[in-house]
Amino acid sequence: MGDLPGLVRLSIALRIQPNDGPVFFKVDGQRFGQNRTIKLLTGSSYKVEVKIKPTTLQVENISIGGVLVPLELKGKEPDGERVVYTGIYDTEGVAPTKSGERQPIQITMPFTDIGTFETVWQVKFYNYHKRDHCQWGSPFSVIEYECKPNETRSLMWVNKESFL
């Protein structure tokens, strides 16, 4: 086991396929558990791109709402700052969220040797007939996290989450 990094910075980007379209969120205020809701379409595929610093860290998959997404190492960014992984998240078979409701979905990403990144996204899944609703709100490119691994190498504490 190597040294435990003081801080881990990671970003998670979602792009709807087949044309790398943006994903949107809306600000719900205090009506639900979180003030931001990510809008996703059922029966769709999303490219997941995970970027990690320090570049020595390794992951094999990310679980999004119980769906295991294998991640493939793509290499380092041109500036060498972060390592890049990609995978495909498929919402086929996911039930649309009822009107006026939101779904908390668990996100987990186990890192080799330093513990598991965990967070919860508040999501609304729209069925294909309401796909225009998925494009109301604010587009985001990436969700960035600043995390601190704990000493037992089991979990990482999330210090900061930013939608950019």
UniProtKB/Swiss-Prot annotation:
GO terms for biological process: regulation of trans-synaptic signaling by endocannabinoid, modulating synaptic transmission. InterPro entries: CNRIP1. Highly expressed in brain. Also detected in heart, lung, intestine, kidney, testis, spleen, liver and muscle (at protein level). One of its GO terms (molecular function) is type 1 cannabinoid receptor binding. GO terms for cellular component: cytoplasm; GABA-ergic synapse; glutamatergic synapse; myelin sheath; plasma membrane; presynapse. Belongs to the CNRIP family. Interacts with the cannabinoid receptor CNR1 (via C-terminus). Does not interact with cannabinoid receptor CNR2. Suppresses cannabinoid receptor CNR1-mediated tonic inhibition of voltage-gated calcium channels. This is CB1 cannabinoid receptor-interacting protein 1. It comes from Mus musculus (Mouse).
